């Protein structure tokens, strides 16, 4: 393998923004935000909109709990239904 062309693979914590569910895994993603995990170590924190804890396929719920989109925010702001 060539040296210096592969991304760094480290442990990171992913957090679901809608349910606040967190899990520790390995990834090449990095972040300036960190969190202290249950083992006492500090890891980079990656926020995600959807994870297995909130996706309808994994939860069995038909309603999708996602953050409001642009159209929804516009309609709320200007009172449209």
Curated annotation (Swiss-Prot):
Question: Pfam families recorded for this chain?
Answer: Ribosomal_L31 (PF01197)
| GO BP terms in the entry | translation
> Which residues form each disulfide bond in the chain?
none
Which controlled-vocabulary keywords does the entry list?
Ribonucleoprotein, Ribosomal protein
Q: Which GO terms label this protein's molecular function in UniProt?
A: structural constituent of ribosome
Q: Which InterPro entries match?
A: Ribosomal_bL28/bL31-like_sf (IPR034704), Ribosomal_bL31 (IPR002150), Ribosomal_bL31_B (IPR027493), Ribosomal_bL31_sf (IPR042105)
Choose one Gene Ontology CC annotation of this protein and give it: ribosome
Q: Which PROSITE patterns match?
A: RIBOSOMAL_L31
Known partners and oligomeric status: Part of the 50S ribosomal subunit.
| Similarity comment: family membership | Belongs to the bacterial ribosomal protein bL31 family. Type B subfamily.
PANTHER family cross-referenced by the UniProt entry: 50S RIBOSOMAL PROTEIN L31, CHLOROPLASTIC, LARGE RIBOSOMAL SUBUNIT PROTEIN BL31C
> What protein does this entry describe?
Large ribosomal subunit protein bL31B
Q: Which organism is it from?
A: Exiguobacterium sibiricum (strain DSM 17290 / CCUG 55495 / CIP 109462 / JCM 13490 / 255-15)
């Amino acid at each position: 393998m060539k040296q210096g062309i592969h991304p760094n693979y480290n442990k990171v914590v992913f957090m679901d923004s809608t349910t606040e569910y967190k899990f520790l895994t390995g990834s090449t993603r990095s972040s300036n935000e960190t969190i202290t995990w249950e083992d006492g170590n500090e890891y980079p924190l990656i926020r995600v909109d959807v994870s297995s804890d909130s996706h309808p396929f994994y939860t069995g719920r038909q309603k999708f709990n996602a953050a409001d989109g642009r159209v929804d925010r516009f309609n709320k702001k200007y009172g449209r239904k």
